């Protein structure tokens, strides 16, 4: 005889069915604000658990990192191959104020650049900006054919690769060490550093597709809320512009002159 539970004698479960509760009733939405170096300032929303007792909702938001496509931040599809990381540093009411936290290019873009018959050259260096941000920058470049070249391949020699890599490191150090982080981010968007590398390395070996492949933030200074809010407020130049006075219509002047006569 098989040993098992007798269905007749077994008792039913206590409590019955559990109540189905909606998880989203315990959560709330916050707006995400991007720094003024980008065109789109409100780039999305984020979800967090509401404040319960000593556990504050803001504590769950601070330090969150959001990866956003640069095409969405600048309304430009030509920049869709770049991804920007923004870190939430400060919360006011329902607004999360973010700061730049890193950059990278998409895998699709990187795979489309790597081709047979060309030399890939990559260099990286650790730099420090004026406002004490320590970054690690990675630069990538590819050789290209010289004018009137009949040879199908264009491989660079080891000595040429070393010279190009040294130039890369020198240019990245020079460009980053003289500016603040916000000014450096403005250089990343139009690839001005990559163009400078391409220009200076032309004599060594002609290059193409020179990009800042990745930017990591190794160390950040202590949070200064006043400096963070400067990144999110518009400059005084726009606020101080004079508005041109509109010309008065003839009907308005006639009415005023008639009232003065009476």
UniProtKB/Swiss-Prot annotation:
Family membership noted in the UniProt record: Belongs to the eukaryotic ribosomal protein eS1 family.
Superkingdom: Eukaryota
Record's keyword annotation contains Lyase: no
Name of the protein: Small ribosomal subunit protein eS1
Keyword field contains Membrane: no
UniProt keyword annotations, A-Z: Cytoplasm, Ribonucleoprotein, Ribosomal protein
BP GO terms, sorted: translation
Native source organism of the sequence: Plasmodium vivax (strain Salvador I)
Subunit structure: Component of the small ribosomal subunit. Mature ribosomes consist of a small (40S) and a large (60S) subunit. The 40S subunit contains about 33 different proteins and 1 molecule of RNA (18S). The 60S subunit contains about 49 different proteins and 3 molecules of RNA (25S, 5.8S and 5S).
Xref: InterPro entries: Ribosomal_eS1, Ribosomal_eS1_euk
């Amino acid at each position: 005889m098989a040993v098992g539970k007798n269905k007749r004698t077994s008792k039913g479960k206590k409590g019955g069915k559990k109540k189905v509760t909606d998880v989203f009733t315990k959560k709330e939405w916050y707006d995400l604000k991007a720094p003024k170096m980008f065109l789109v300032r409100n780039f999305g929303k984020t979800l967090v658990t509401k404040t319960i007792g000593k556990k504050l909702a803001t504590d769950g938001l601070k330090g969150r990192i959001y990866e956003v496509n640069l095409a969405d931040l600048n309304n430009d599809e030509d920049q869709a191959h770049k991804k920007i990381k923004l870190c939430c540093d400060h919360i006011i009411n329902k607004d999360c104020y973010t700061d730049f936290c890193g950059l990278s290019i998409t895998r699709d873009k990187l795979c489309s650049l790597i081709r047979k018959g060309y030399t890939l050259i990559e260099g990286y260096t650790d730099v420090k900006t004026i406002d004490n941000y320590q970054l690690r920058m990675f630069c990538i470049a590819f050789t290209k054919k010289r004018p009137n070249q009949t040879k199908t391949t264009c491989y660079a020699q080891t000595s040429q690769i070393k010279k190009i890599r040294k130039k890369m490191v020198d240019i990245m150090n020079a460009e980053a060490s003289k500016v603040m982080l916000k000014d450096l981010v403005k250089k990343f968007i139009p690839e001005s550093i990559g163009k400078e590398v391409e220009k200076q390395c032309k004599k060594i070996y002609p290059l193409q597709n020179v990009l800042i492949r990745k930017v990591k933030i190794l160390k950040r200074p202590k949070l200064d809320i006043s400096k963070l809010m400067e990144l999110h407020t518009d400059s005084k130049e726009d606020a101080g512009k004079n508005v041109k006075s509109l010309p008065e219509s003839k009907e308005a002047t006639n009415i005023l002159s008639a009232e003065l006569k009476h």
